[in-house]
């Protein structure tokens, strides 16, 4: 039986306010248990999991989660902080913010002491929902829950504001840190620097960086990576390299991402050899090349049609005992398929599976599109089956390509199978995709395949 939380709150006004940090044995319930109704005995040892939390994990529907919360409460279970926080997280994740507000009122009424991490999570969920004002409101109310507010929650709020395009508000809260008796750390400055760089305001970002040094806050590798990345994207490699030297002088060790940003900048300028040289120079600076560095070089070679050189880099990785991941393999698969070297791409797919690297949706999609490109629809269908078995799903465009190709090849049974799969997956072409299919089969080729298409659709 479900009860609205508002009625529970009214009934609970009669109960004396006290903190609850443990469970007590309730009276035995008289009503029949539902599928999610608690049946546990509430006496437990300290190391045992709370029965409410165990049941809550099995529920996806937020309304059912609320119902379970009330059922436990009616049976005498005394909810503590882990119960409240778990329920609040689940409700916030589903964006049931009205229920979140009600539970928070109950938390305050019961004087349950909360951790700052609860409010940080709520601020993030409000930010993802675009509810900036609610995020700010939660931040202001943290102390009213007998919780100490630190720079961590301020950083969370500033980040949410920056992500939602509220840079001025973010700077205002940053400037007000002193009034809140909080001292900004490197994370605080990094968030603002990133925000200004996203707005292409280099001068403002530099001003924040200077302020960071004035306050004697040590810049981190993230700080420099943000600045170097911006300069590389804007083709100012001279300044980017100067910043690299500056961070080394300050004994801030560059990481693989730092060198990756510089390498990508050099590749964009057509200086592949310089980028490759930099990758090997980084070892002398105490930084081992990683997947990101090899990926940048392989992507650049692929774009320039130098796929065989990219394959040599893959072999070099193996010699250095750097295990390629799905991203690395996908770079090769993509460019091989683009160059219509699809059988080679398929061998790469087979190799990655033998090496224990699972293909992702992008891998399968590129392979299917590649086989469609060379009009080998039977092989494409085999890859499609493997993709579906791996619980991945092609895009409507890939389905259209497969259906059109199979119909043109006279393989109507397999075309029907593909449409059947779409139906089982509750997928639809969409009006645009259907138009493309009709155009491909009934217009471009003089309408010779219209009858076959009609037959497939009727089946």
Curated annotation (Swiss-Prot):
Keywords: Mitochondrion, Repeat, Transit peptide. This is Pentatricopeptide repeat-containing protein At1g07740, mitochondrial. Its main location: mitochondrion. Residues 1-20 form a transit peptide. It comes from Arabidopsis thaliana. It comes from the Eukaryota. Residues 19-41 are annotated as: Disordered. PPR repeats lie at residues 80-114, 115-149, 150-184, 185-219, 220-254, 255-289, 290-324, 325-359, 360-394, 395-429. Pfam families: PPR (PF01535), PPR_2 (PF13041). Disulfide bonds: none annotated. Residues 24-41 have a biased composition (Basic and acidic residues). GO terms for cellular component: mitochondrion. Signal peptide: none annotated. It is found in: Mitochondrion. Coiled coil: none annotated. The keyword Mitochondrion applies. NCBIfam families: PPR. Belongs to the PPR family. P subfamily. Transmembrane segments: none annotated.
């Amino acid at each position: 039986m479900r009860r609205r939380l508002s009625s529970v709150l009214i009934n609970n006004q009669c109960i004396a306010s006290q903190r609850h940090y443990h469970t007590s044995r309730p009276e035995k319930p008289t009503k029949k248990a539902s599928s999610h109704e608690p049946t546990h005995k509430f006496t437990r040892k300290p190391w045992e999991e709370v029965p409410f939390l165990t049941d809550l994990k099995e529920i996806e529907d937020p309304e059912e989660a609320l119902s379970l919360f009330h059922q436990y409460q009616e049976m005498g279970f005394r909810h503590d902080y882990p119960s409240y926080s778990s329920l609040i997280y689940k409700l916030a994740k589903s964006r049931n913010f009205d229920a979140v507000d009600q539970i928070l009122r109950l938390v305050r009424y019961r004087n349950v002491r909360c951790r700052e991490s609860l409010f940080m999570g709520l601020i993030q969920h409000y930010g993802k929902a675009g509810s900036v004002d609610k995020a700010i409101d939660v931040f202001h109310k943290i102390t009213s829950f007998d919780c100490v507010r630190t720079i961590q929650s301020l950083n969370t709020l500033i980040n949410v504001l920056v992500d939602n395009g509220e840079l001025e508000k973010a700077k205002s809260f940053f400037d007000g840190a002193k009034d809140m008796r909080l001292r900004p750390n490197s994370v605080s400055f990094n968030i603002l620097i990133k925000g200004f760089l996203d707005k292409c305001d280099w001068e403002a970002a530099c001003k924040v960086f200077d302020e960071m040094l004035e306050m004697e806050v040590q810049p981190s590798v993230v700080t420099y990576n943000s600045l170097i990345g911006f300069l590389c994207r804007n083709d100012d490699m001279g300044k980017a390299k100067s910043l690299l030297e500056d961070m080394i002088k300050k004994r801030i060790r560059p990481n693989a991402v730092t060198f990756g940003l510089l390498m990508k900048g050099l590749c964009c300028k057509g200086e592949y050899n310089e980028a490759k040289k930099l990758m090997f120079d980084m070892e002398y600076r105490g930084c081992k090349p990683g997947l990101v560095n090899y990926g940048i070089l392989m992507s650049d070679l692929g774009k320039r049609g130098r796929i065989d050189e990219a394959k040599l880099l893959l072999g070099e990785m193996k010699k250095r005992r750097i295990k390629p991941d799905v991203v690395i393999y996908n770079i090769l698969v993509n460019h091989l398929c683009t160059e219509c070297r699809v059988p080679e791409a398929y061998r790469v797919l087979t190799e990655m599976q033998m090496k224990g690297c699972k293909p992702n949706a992008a891998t399968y999609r590129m392979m299917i599109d590649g086989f469609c490109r060379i009009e080998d629809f039977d092989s494409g269908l085999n890859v499609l089956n493997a993709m579906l078995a791996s619980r991945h799903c092609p895009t409507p465009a890939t389905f259209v390509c497969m259906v059109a190709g199979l119909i043109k090849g006279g393989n109507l049974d397999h075309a029907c199978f593909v449409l059947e799969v779409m139906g089982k997956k509750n997928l639809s072409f969409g009006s645009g995709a259907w138009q493309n299919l009709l155009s491909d089969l009934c217009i471009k080729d003089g309408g010779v395949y219209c009858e076959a298409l009609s037959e497939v659709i009727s089946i």
